[in-house]
Amino acid sequence: MLSILKKLFGTANDRTVKKLFSEITKINSLEPAIQKLSDEELKNKTVEFKEKLKNGATLDDIVYEAFAVVREAAKRVCGMRHFDVQLIGGLILHRGMITEMRTGEGKTLVATLPAYLNALTGKGVHVVTVNDYLARRDSASMGKIYNFLGLSVGCIVGGMPDEVKRAAYNADITHATNNELGFDYLRDNMKYSLQERVLRPFNFAIIDEVDSILIDEARTPLVISGPVNDNAELYGKIDKIVRLLNASDFEKDEKLKTINLTETGITHIESLLSKESIIKPDTSLYDFENLTLVHYVNQALRAHNMFTVNVDYLVREGKVMIIDEFTGRVMEGRRYSEGLHQALEAKENVKIQNENQTLASITFQNYFRNYPKLSGMTGTAMTEAPELKDIYNLDVVAVPTHNKVTRLDLDDEIYGSKKEKYDAILKLIRDCYDRGQPILVGTISIEKSEELSSVLNKEKIPHKVLNAKFHEQEAFIIAQAGRFKAVTIATNMAGRGTDIMLGGNPEMLIEQLDKEHNYEAKIAEIKAQIAEEKKQVIEAGGLFVIGTERHESRRIDNQLRGRSGRQGDPGKTKFFLSLDDDLMRIFASDRISGVLRTLGLKDGEAIHHPMISRSLEKAQQKVEGHNYEMRKNLLRFDDVMNDQRKIIYEQRTEIIKSKDSHGFLNSTTEELAQKIVLTFMPVGSYREDWDIENLSVELHRVFSIKFDHNVVSKNDVTEEEITKIVIQMAHDIYKSKEEAYSSELMHNAVKYILLTTLDQVWKDHLYSLDHLRQGISLRAYGQKDPLSEYKREAFNLFEQMLNNLKELFIQTVYHFHIDLKNVQKEDVLLEYKKLQKNMRESREDPAFSKYNAGSSIETDLKPVVSRIDPKDRNPDDPTSWGRVSRNELCPCGSGKKYKYCHGANE
């Protein structure tokens, strides 16, 4: 019934596109008049548009004319005229939606339309790409159009100094990678001066390959961290011990990606640890004194049994480098969290780097939701449309192709074993190669690509391998994958963003030329060669894309198919599968193997059966659903931290902007003075119960006040009067500092102290949230909702952090005894630059991140070490208390706060 209605009325997407086509006629009707304009008149349109906006017009009032102007500018500058479907894509982007456009449909050119229009407001537009190469390429090629129309263009890539970045961000249109944008946001919120920041306020972002950034990388937080304790030696010792364990000593679950010691494994490892004198004889690994070792053992187990070299990571130049599971690229600068990276370094016998503590972090989910207006483009988004709407409130519109797709997608072939599958792939490659038909073979890992490469080498078939090991040549290799007799092996979607043109890409070949010798003649020769090869390739059937395995996501499979058949070119695609494939082995039905045998599958034979295809699709849907839930769950938890992050960053900015720091200082002084006095002189208590001795100690500790006991000896003195006296004494101390060093210098000093103190307590708070997050899933065993518990405890920790901030700030201000004349703005910036040298930027692994609640095997350890439920604490045994807040009542039962009792010496 539903299919009949769709045929009659069309889908919602069809109706949207039809409506947009009616708007395109308005743009096309303006073209004749725009074509008659001189270059100077066309450029002046930008000034005219800005004037209209200044006088109250909206972007929607000028959208059609602006698009017509960009189309004409592109034609004059680059020789490219926007097709009608590209204009539709531009309207979709301008309206804050995602446009799905097939590979080769010119998404880069489409982005110029909304980028130009929205840049007219002067607030800046960010065009976001997935790597530095694409950011440079697009800013250079499309920048010609913007410059012609009088707009400035910037490009952000890794390693740029701040002054260069600042100029690039101040441009009308800025091309940047998603990583650099996120890290610059975090870095800006760690600086001590507004002038040092590089970013402008958020306005509008257009994300290229939006599905890759907002979905594939959504679970991967951007993290800036600083070094902590050096435990390299211990990682090395534990690694040697874990190598001695037997298969029966642990059990792992590939679906959940978890690994745990068995009872026999615990006994075995305890004896090994004891022999190496790492734990005392007759003690357990889970005794309180040894609990920290559990973390090292678990990470070493993961490193040896859940991670494979050249699949999950590779070793290059003595470093362990992570391979992105979705693109097959090396993730430069990214390190696994929680000591896992150190465990891998120990496993591979390379130098073990120090662990790091988080100083700032954010996920792409929350970073990109900062933009008031967000849009994106990709070749594959419809399968993820519900998630994009649910999480980012972004609608997806699929735009029809300019030319009809003639590519032929052949049925999958399924074999009983990997060897049989490879034999079939080899046979097809040989056939295509002999006919000159170019082939792109997609694999899911470096290991698989090199495995296939060795098979082709034995058969003496020339080919190129594109994977994380050759990232630098990625764009060039993929661009030439459409040449006559070309055979290219690529991991996953490496090279995404670069079109495969039949016959080859002349521009990239021209870039390789020596400009000093016969340059023009060589260009003509290359163009003639490419034209001839294109004819040969079309006659051979176009690009043949071979998939060696199904990916967990149907979208990734569709991306691979989409490399063939661009702009109406001929082409074919085919997937080859075996029962040994990860997806089949882990997620598909266990009955498939039996069914194949029942159907009479023999060695070397392939089978096509609807049930197999359905089972595969169900397996993919199951994994997609599982990953969606994980991303959704991450967002629910991360929103808690995000709300707190926004408050802290807003407060930090207000502090930097403030011209008078005395307001916060005075109010906090009064608040703490009252709190301290009432702690030792409770309201309504008898004078003999007043603890004047400890009151004096605490006032000196916090305010540097030398409290005169004689003040209390007066019979009629009250707690309120004592509070007023203490506040006045504190003000007098501060006033004496102002007289000695001037109000301006004290203002700078107080502001600097407040900022550095805020940074310190925020860093400690992030650490506490990390520990809380890792163990929160265990609350489910107690019939409690982990998310509700996390929200409640995170709020309590946040309140505690604010209290700690006030106390540390006041304590530092009143105890300042250094030469305050030297605390200038320049010194503040110098301090930040010193900190910057030791900071590390990283991307945490999505599968084994601390944010992946439920899959982390430290969950047994961290809640015990960090916080203990008060009712489980033994008053007579401090080792059972866990971490105690300074402002909590001491667990010993004395009735005093912990900081005045057992925590007095901490």
Swiss-Prot record:
Keyword Nucleotidyltransferase in annotation: no
Co-factor requirement: Zn(2+)
Keywords in alphabetical order: ATP-binding, Cell inner membrane, Cell membrane, Cytoplasm, Membrane, Metal-binding, Nucleotide-binding, Protein transport, Translocase, Translocation, Transport, Zinc
GO molecular function list: ATP binding; metal ion binding; protein-exporting ATPase activity
Pfam families the UniProt entry points to: P-loop_SecA (PF21090), SEC-C (PF02810), SecA_DEAD (PF07517), SecA_PP_bind (PF01043), SecA_SW (PF07516)
Cofactor-binding details, from the entry: May bind 1 zinc ion per subunit.
Record-listed E.C. numbers: 7.4.2.8
Group of enzyme by EC: translocase
Keyword Mitochondrion annotated: no
Catalytic activity: ATP + H2O + cellular proteinSide 1 = ADP + phosphate + cellular proteinSide 2
Gene Ontology BP, a term: protein transport by the Sec complex
Record InterPro entries: Helicase_ATP-bd, P-loop_NTPase, SEC_C_motif, SecA, SecA_CS, SecA_DEAD, SecA_motor_DEAD, SecA_preprotein_X-link_dom
Membrane topology: Peripheral membrane protein
Subcellular localization, as worded in the UniProt entry: Cell inner membrane; Cytoplasm
UniProt-annotated stretches for the region Disordered: 861-887
Residues the entry annotates as binding ATP: Q86, G104, E105, G106, K107, T108, D499
SUPFAM superfamilies: Helical scaffold and wing domains of SecA, P-loop containing nucleoside triphosphate hydrolases, Pre-protein crosslinking domain of SecA
Assembly mode: Monomer and homodimer. Part of the essential Sec protein translocation apparatus which comprises SecA, SecYEG and auxiliary proteins SecDF-YajC and YidC.
Reported function: Part of the Sec protein translocase complex. Interacts with the SecYEG preprotein conducting channel. Has a central role in coupling the hydrolysis of ATP to the transfer of proteins into and across the cell membrane, serving both as a receptor for the preprotein-SecB complex and as an ATP-driven molecular motor driving the stepwise translocation of polypeptide chains across the membrane.
PANTHER family in the cross-refs: CHLOROPLAST PROTEIN-TRANSPORTING ATPASE, SECA INNER MEMBRANE COMPONENT OF SEC PROTEIN SECRETION SYSTEM
Name this polypeptide is given: Protein translocase subunit SecA
UniProt organism field: Rickettsia conorii (strain ATCC VR-613 / Malish 7)
Organism taxonomic ancestry: Bacteria, Pseudomonadati, Pseudomonadota, Alphaproteobacteria, Rickettsiales
